[in-house]
UniProtKB/Swiss-Prot annotation:
Domain Ig-like: residue ranges: 1-114
Record's protein name: Ig heavy chain V region HPCG8
Native source organism of the sequence: Mus musculus
Entries under InterPro entries matching the protein: Ig-like_dom (IPR007110), Ig-like_dom_sf (IPR036179), Ig-like_fold (IPR013783), Ig_sub (IPR003599), Ig_V-set (IPR013106), IgHV (IPR050199)
One annotated GO molecular function: antigen binding
Gene Ontology cellular component terms for the protein in this record: extracellular region; immunoglobulin complex
PROSITE patterns per UniProt: IG_LIKE
């Protein structure tokens, strides 16, 4: 069974940091692009970060809204995806999801999702 389980969310003050984790199982982690997507309260899903697969040297890509503040990385030995979030802002408040990108296309083929972890940025 393919599983993605996020953790690490919580309440943090503006300017603070959090690291989210996404523990994966049931598939060959290195073969797949992995993505972070978020949903702010009352808003649509927003793609924020990608980690390409081993064939593409696990290179990364970010949305303009988080570039320079967030860092996506992998622990390939434990099949864990991370999202280091720095300089957090109120507008980063959201449910954060990791997703497997089956075809390596950020836009259409997210075939497995975790349940999400909630991040609240507030003083």
């Amino acid at each position: 069974e393919v599983k993605l389980v996020e953790s690490g969310g919580g309440l943090v003050q503006p300017g603070g940091s959090l690291r989210l984790s996404c523990a994966t199982s049931g598939f060959t982690f290195s073969d797949f692009y992995m993505e972070w997507v978020r949903q702010p309260p009352g808003k649509r899903l927003e793609w924020i970060a990608a980690s390409r697969n081993k064939a593409f040297d696990y290179t990364t890509e970010y949305s303009a809204s988080v570039k320079g503040r967030f860092i996506v990385s992998r622990d390939t030995s434990q099949s864990i995806l991370y999202l280091q979030m720095n300089a957090l802002r109120a507008e980063d408040t959201a449910i954060y999801y990791c997703a497997r990108d089956y075809y390596g296309s950020r836009y259409w083929y997210f075939d497995v999702w975790g349940a999400g972890t909630t991040v609240t940025v507030s003083s």
